[in-house]
Amino acid sequence: MNYDIIDAKYIEGYKLELIFKDGKKGIVDLSVYIHKGGVFSRFTDIEYFKQFYVNREIGTLCWPDGLDIAPETLYHVATGEPLPVWTKTEKAVA
């Protein structure tokens, strides 16, 4: 998929430069994930965060314990391109 990440470089703090399969690249600031809690609460430890790697099999960023972020979400944040339609949820009909 074009959303697949082929390379990632640490910049500073929670900022990474990502390069995608379609040649586009951009910078993402993943500090917003700290406030999401749950599995992302691990990001409060910057040394943990820096252990990211690109899993080429699934085309996204991963961390050693299996945590990952959807590549289409990262593509949207890095490039400003809209999220694919299939990622949007429909409102429930009452």
What are these regions (language model features)?
Residues 1-94:
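Motif-centric detector for short Cys/His coordination patterns
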